[in-house]
């Protein structure tokens, strides 16, 4: 990136007096061919209707860094209602921040009106204990720049002349690969504690250093995340863990003492007696997920959260077994308890929580080789996910390698051959087997020419 130096990082107290640094088209690398058609249509229609229209935020940042962003946000002086009047394919969303979503097939372009700097009670602005709960006070572009979180996210690409406007020193921070908050860090984190998670995520994604001023308050203010809605934290966790840089995000969350606020059981397990094995398991699972994301292969939150909470579930099940719980009951109770505890921090949707529960509860069943149990497990709709999780565990638990090999071979066998290989031994070969459990009169009655000596014939599998 070949950009001229900026003169100052200072953010003036009076936003309206800010004078932007303007980088003309010839001095930055943003090309319209790297901007989506939907975003360009929104920008041009707003501009042609007499409004200011800027590409803003992460898209501008990533374009300046030579990336190819997938999501595009637009900032304008048009109100949400004025934006909706220009686009039939537009819907208004949000109470905390009123936004316009313009839909082009599968692409959604988010359009936000410039935010103003208002005091509590001004217009539609509501603040409690420093946290902004609702904010629909509008202003100019200078105020909007001051209101953004990090300097590198406060760069504006002007569709009128294709220049980039920088009000807060974001260009220099891009050059220095520094993540710097706009304004007083403690105040900004109190306004929205999720900004601490964003600091970890962006530093991981971009491989930027968090500035000393921005990092200093994080560990002390991390408990503020307990007041954030669990549903919102689930959305943030997807950005952290399923965007192709999950492993590095996890490391930075842990080092900043943020992991314990969103996944407390995981953080405790990473300090527990099995921390090294559990840490390696998480490393394998997150690295695999990152590779799938980078190769545009599908990923599911259920699998990653299964890994994040595996050691807490396993440890709780072992503790309950030590208290005398029956095996299956110990695992069921452990799963229920850990999921309940996690739900107080991150609201994992039911469809994912159910998948996690099945992945965990199927793990002990891989130890069983009785024919009926094997056939039922192979036919289970969650078998493949549970098997993949078993393979993941085997990287750090060598004693599972034999199980993995056996179940891998079992999947490659026909149902008939697998059933035959698991047939119950005849009485002559297993004298200690209870005779009553060997004889299946009704099955032998239906099957002509069954083997003599009471040996059971192959079980019929649905769809065989």
What does each of the following model-derived ranges do?
Residues 1-464:
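Catalytic cores of the polymerase beta-like nucleotidyltransferase superfamily
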